[in-house]
Amino acid sequence: MFDVDLENGVSFRESKAFKPGDRAVVAETPWCGLGMTVCYDVRFAYLYRALAKAGASVLMVPAAFTRQTGHAHWHILLQARAIETGCYVVAPAQCGDHEDGRQTYGHSLIVAPWGEILADGGEEPGVVMAELDFSRIDKARGMVPALSHDRDFAPPAPLGLRAAGE
């Protein structure tokens, strides 16, 4: 959950209204597996890798990023999730100015497995569409087979204290 107190006195407390899920979900459809996530989840790359390994071809990321954070991170994070998994990313995004003063970024996106943005809804309400060619998933994963090369790592050993200049 996105709970944070910002320096300017603004606070966000998603935990007051929402309960976090306890498992990743891939929904099977007649067309493909949909990896189901929401908003803040996009910051946890391992979740998207797990969804792709479990059969997701399309990663769903509905979100309500603030205008400031969205401008800095939204496109980059979604493109990274597409590239590192070889999946399409479909990310509907809330936009506009809200009664509580919050401003959301918008830019509903559809991103291809190679990272290209296929559709960008901009900052106004609307609909975005793109054709998903599922052969591009195998092509992207064949060119960068990171999912098949992925493996678990032991935690890093703590660094010992070092003298200055070492």
Regions found by a protein language model. Name each.
Residues 130, 135:
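Glycine-rich, small/acidic residue-mixed loop/short-helix segments
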Residues 6-9, 17-21, 90-92, 109-114, ...:
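Short amphipathic alpha-helical surface micro-motifs
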Residues 137-166:
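A conserved C-terminal secondary-structure "cap"
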Residues 5, 122, 152-154:
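Intrinsically disordered, low-complexity regions of eukaryotic proteins
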Residues 33, 42-128:
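CN hydrolase (nitrilase-like) catalytic-core segments centered on the catalytic cysteine
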Residues 1-54, 67-76, 143-146:
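Active-site catalytic loop in hydrolytic enzyme cores
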